[in-house]
């Protein structure tokens, strides 16, 4: 049941991971159904021998639920042979096997970087059998997200504001769009 979620920031990967935890709990695949979110900083320590313990602690807290590792590719930095990220991956692979009956691991990140992560350890790629890509939202979808978030907060988006936001979206370069953050960017736009 381990999964790989790929896509840009703000496309719903964490939100879907939370929903998967609830669904798997209701279906009886998981005993507790909690979602433990972490990233490289939650798994990698600064000194030899500390990383394996840190990974073990995080995995133990996720037993019965889902361990969601955001930006998992950061564990497999190329050209960093003395980096402890590879130790974290090695430990994770072993623990995924040891606890395969009551732990789901979901790793998430950018598509290209996730390929590098999955091929960084011979046993890693075979542990994941479900791959879900989260495409960027269209401008129309982003506008709907803006309006939905505004409504939740008791606001209505005026036609003038819609025009300004749509103009902002259509005027973005590809690089700016990558940094914008999709739904997260719309939430931030509303808060401004």
Regions found by a protein language model. Give the residues of each.
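Conserved RecA-like P-loop NTPase ATPase core
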Residues: 14, 38, 55, 70, ...
């Amino acid at each position: 049941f381990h999964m790989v979620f790929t896509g840009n920031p703000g496309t719903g990967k964490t939100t879907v991971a939370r929903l998967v935890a609830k669904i798997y709990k209701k279906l009886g695949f998981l005993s507790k159904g909690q979602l433990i979110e972490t990233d490289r900083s939650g798994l990698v320590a600064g000194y030899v021998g500390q990383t394996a313990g840190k990974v073990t602690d995080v995995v133990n807290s996720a037993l019965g639920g889902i361990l969601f590792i955001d930006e998992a590719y950061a564990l497999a930095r190329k050209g960093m042979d003395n980096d402890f990220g590879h130790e974290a991956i090695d430990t994770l692979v072993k623990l995924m096997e040891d606890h395969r009956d009551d732990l789901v691991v979901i790793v998430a990140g950018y598509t290209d970087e996730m390929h590098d992560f999955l091929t960084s350890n011979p046993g890693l790629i075979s542990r994941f059998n479900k791959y879900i890509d989260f495409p960027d939202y269209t401008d129309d979808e982003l506008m709907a997200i803006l309006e939905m978030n505004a409504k939740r907060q008791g606001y209505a988006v005026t036609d003038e504001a819609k025009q300004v936001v749509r103009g902002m979206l259509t005027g973005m370069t590809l690089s700016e769009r990558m940094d914008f953050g999709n739904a997260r960017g719309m939430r931030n736009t509303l808060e401004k």
